[in-house]
Amino acid sequence: SEFFLQVLGPHLKYSCGWWDDSINNLEQSEEAALKKTCENADLQDGQNVLELGCGWGSLSLWMAKHYPNSKITSVSNSTSQKAFIDQRAQKRGLENLEVITCDMNDFETKKRFERIVSVEMFEHIRNWPVLFNKVASWMKKDSKFLMHVFCHGKTPYFFEAVNEDDWMARYFFSGGIMPSDQL
C-alpha cells in the first residue's frame, strides 16, 4: 500500500479519472470520476449497493460518505486492501460499509441489491456469462447494474505472460482479458 499511497491520488483510485476543462489536478479528477460513476449508476441515498472489485476502496468509501443511509457491500480479493479500507472507514466514522474478501469467481450472497457497480474488474474475469448470471441473481426487481470496463476498439485478447515484456499480464491482469467493443 505504501507504493500506491505515493503514486495515486488521495482517493487511491487506480481506475481511470475524469478530466474536463474544469479539472486541474489528480485529486479533482478522482473526485469527478467517483461522482460520475455514482451518477451513471443512478445511486440514491438509502439503497443497498454492491461493489464488485473495490481495489483500495476509492468508490466504496466515496459512496459510504455521500450516501450515508445506504448500505455499501464491497468485494475485494485482497486481505490487505480490505484491512486498508476498514481502517479508513473507521477513521472517517463510516459505519455503512462492509468489505468482504473473496475471489469474484467464488463470491456468493443471499442479499439482494438495488444497485450493483463494477469499475474495471470484469477485465480480470474470463467467464463473463457465469458472473452475469450471478449478478442478475443478486438484483432486486428494479435494480440497475453499472459495469465500467476498458476495452480495445477492435480486437479482444487474453493477458498472458509469455515473456518478460508482458508486464501487464504478469503484474496487473494475470488471467484477464482485454474485451473489445464488439465482444
Residue spans for each PLM region:
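A short acidic, Gly/Pro-enriched loop at the edge of an enzyme's catalytic core
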Residues: 105-116
